[in-house]
Amino acid sequence: VSLASNASQTFTNNAIQLSTVPRCIYIWASRANSSKTIETSDTFLKINSLSLNYLNVSGQFSSMSLQDLYQICAKNGCNLSYSEWSGKCMTIGDSHTAPAVVGMVGSVLKLDIADLHIPSNVASGMNVNSQLSYTIGVENIDQTQAIPVQLTTCVVYDGLMTIESGSMSSMI
């Protein structure tokens, strides 16, 4: 799906089957890989809203504002300013030019397991069969062109990987 400049749309991801409780989850929307070139920037669409379903708890984060989502990301290690993360800022005009909107980095959500509403007897790394799904509202912050949208979810687990004598073993 291509999203026009400054347009917003809601997307729903396909449910992801998980067998272990993750440490954190990254969610972002960006230009589709198939349309990236050497001339396109590594930026993201602005995330306006999120409603996440995990461990039979639906609607998580659905009442949060853009500022609330940014605060979660900042708490979880994001070092972007609010303007950079939310994707837009204004230039200062002068007597010859009017102020203009400038697209910035855009939003990547990092949700720590502690941010999720999960049962108190469940912790990161536990073997629990579950599904993760979400509906996300995004906005194309590119000021000039439509962008084909790609949703990405990165689920992070704690673990240990050992590389020795050319072979690898892992413990999750």
What residues fall within each predicted segment?
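Flexible assembly/topogenesis modules
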Residues: 1-172
